[in-house]
């Protein structure tokens, strides 16, 4: 049994920070950042919590879907930057929405929304759920070294969500994989003390090997799109829309060039949002839907890639 996307939603913090503002305390400039990343600004939480963003995106998706939270059978949330390690971010969303269904998180870094969508589809396929809220919310700016211009200029905060319902022919194809590598892109875990183990001070901030990420990202997008098309029995040219993880414009540009697809079929939100990890894909999907660009029968390729190194691809049919 497949599913249909009933509605989408997204949310961004009110505060938008431009490249020029970053140049006030970093050795950088708008030109330096934009030419290397394609980013002009990013949204940053000031008064908002991650719970606020996740709930706002979820409420919008429910509103568009015409579904009340009490009708949900499951909530799956993708995040690596939750307001709390426990309970799950999904539980906070459920509480504020007034839902009483099972709720839990999935952690697969920037590929997380696709993995969460696959978990939701599995519940539907087994008859365990009929309506599922899938949400991705990230506050990446809390995990950055704001003195490191190579990383802090890339990321922002935000959330995206989708409500799916049993019935329909999505997914047409699924590709999930992991190329195990825990050093290329990582954020250290808890820094605590224990009388039984010597502890060294360590800042819990993101570190990244940019060159490795570039090569990995381009290959992940291209290989996954080709696999999705083959599995669905169509050609890459038959895919109407491409929603890729918004990591860096150079990655997107190189991937689009290699795939040979029209640039107008590729959704881009990077310029004004930066990289918001797993929230990139659902936010971009919501932008696409709000623009009136999606029509019944359209095919949409979602491809996320990130730390782990995890890769997630989904080929959907819009209805």
Q: What residue ranges belong to the model's regions?
A:
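Acidic-glycine-rich active-site phosphate/pyrophosphate-binding loop
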Residues: 26-32, 84-98, 134-140, 192-199, ...
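Claisen-condensing/thiolase-fold acyl-transfer catalytic domains that form or cleave C-C bonds
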Residues: 55-58, 62, 81-82, 92-95, ...
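Short acidic, glycine/serine/threonine-rich loops at helix termini
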Residues: 16-17, 86-88, 144-148, 311-315
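Phosphate/pyrophosphate-binding loops at sites that engage ATP/ADP/AMP, CoA/4′-phosphopantetheine
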Residues: 57-73, 223-240, 288-293
């Amino acid at each position: 049994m497949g599913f249909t996307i009933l509605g989408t939603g997204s949310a961004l913090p009110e505060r938008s920070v431009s490249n020029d503002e970053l140049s006030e305390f970093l050795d950088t400039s708008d030109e330096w950042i934009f030419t290397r990343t394609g980013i002009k600004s990013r949204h940053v939480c000031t008064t908002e919590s991650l719970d606020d963003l996740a709930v706002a995106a979820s409420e919008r998706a429910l509103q568009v879907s015409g579904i009340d939270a009490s009708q949900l059978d499951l909530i799956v949330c993708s995040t690596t930057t939750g307001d709390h390690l426990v309970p799950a971010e999904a539980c906070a969303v459920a509480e504020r929405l007034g839902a009483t269904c099972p709720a839990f998180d999935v952690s697969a870094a920037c590929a997380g929304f696709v993995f969460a969508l696959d978990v939701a589809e599995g519940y539907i396929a087994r008859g365990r759920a009929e309506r599922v809220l899938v949400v991705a919310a990230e506050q990446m700016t809390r995990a950055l070294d704001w003195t490191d211009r190579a990383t802090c200029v890339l990321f922002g905060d935000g959330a995206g969500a989708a409500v799916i319902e049993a019935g329909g022919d999505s997914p047409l194809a699924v590709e999930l994989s992991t190329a195990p590598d825990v050093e290329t892109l990582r954020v250290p875990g808890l820094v605590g003390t224990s009388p039984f183990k010597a502890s060294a001070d360590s800042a819990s901030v993101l570190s990244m090997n940019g060159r490795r990420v570039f090569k990995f990202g381009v290959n992940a997008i291209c290989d996954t799109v080709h696999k999705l098309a083959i599995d669905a029995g169509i050609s890459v040219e038959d895919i109407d829309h491409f929603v890729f993880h918004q990591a860096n414009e150079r990655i997107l540009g190189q991937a689009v060039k290699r795939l040979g697809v029209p640039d107008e079929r590729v959704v881009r939100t990077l310029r004004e949002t930066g990289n918001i990890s797993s929230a990139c894909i659902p936010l971009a999907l919501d932008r696409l839907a709000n623009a009136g660009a999606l029509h019944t029968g359209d095919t949409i390729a979602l491809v996320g890639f990130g730390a782990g190194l995890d890769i997630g691809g989904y080929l959907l049919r819009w209805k």
